[in-house]
């Protein structure tokens, strides 16, 4: 009887993990998805943090001219290079489509700039397809910009 209950608990734990992954992970990139980005933004907005928003250029053109498979490759290439370019202990996620976000906790402006340079370096290493993106960032004491980031995430 105890073994049966233990098996049930383990099975429920696995199912909960799978559901959580589906709710919070972007299947295409393996990065946290818009739901997780919104949750982090809501929970962390009061703390000392910076927010960087990235918007891939030319995704629609790539999709239309080279096909969605190539567009998916473009998105995945950027996602991998974004993750490589940002310090391991910082958060990066995909908000949807061609939009990505990074949250930096307890960092200086110089740290953010260094991470942005690292992302740029990683993206230039991708020789198979040129990665192009504008990036903007705000600091936690700039509530107007953070509110704008929330609006972007909510799709308004």
Where are these regions (language model features)?
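Extended, non-catalytic scaffold segments that flank or surround catalytic motifs
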Residues: 78, 118-119, 132-137
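A short glycine-enriched loop-to-beta-strand structural element that forms part of the catalytic core
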Residues: 50, 103, 128-156
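Regulatory sensory/coupling modules that transmit signals to nucleotide-handling catalytic cores
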Residues: 1-17, 115, 121, 125, ...
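Conserved long alpha-helical elements within nucleotide-processing catalytic cores of c-di-GMP signaling
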Residues: 21-24, 30-50, 57-87, 93-97, ...
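Short catalytic/binding micro-motifs of nucleotide second-messenger systems
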Residues: 84-89, 118-130
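Short, conserved charged micro-motifs
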Residues: 109-114, 145
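Hydrophobic pocket-lining residues within nucleotide cofactor-binding pockets
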Residues: 31, 56, 107, 138-140
């Amino acid at each position: 009887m105890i073994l049966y209950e233990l098996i049930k608990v383990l099975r429920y734990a696995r199912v909960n993990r799978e559901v959580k992954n589906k709710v919070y992970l972007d299947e295409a990139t393996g990065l946290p998805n818009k739901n997780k980005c919104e949750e982090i933004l809501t929970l962390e907005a009061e703390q000392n943090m910076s927010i960087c928003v990235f918007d891939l250029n030319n995704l629609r053109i790539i999709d239309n001219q080279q096909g969605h498979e190539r567009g998916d490759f473009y998105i995945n290439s950027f996602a991998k290079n974004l993750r490589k370019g940002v310090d391991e202990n910082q958060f990066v996620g995909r908000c949807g489509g061609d939009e990505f976000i990074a949250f930096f906790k307890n960092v200086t402006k110089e740290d953010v700039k260094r991470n942005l340079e690292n992302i740029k370096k990683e993206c230039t290493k991708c020789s198979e397809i040129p990665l192009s993106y504008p990036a903007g960032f705000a600091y936690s004491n700039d509530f107007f910009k953070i509110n704008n980031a929330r609006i972007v995430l909510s799709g308004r």
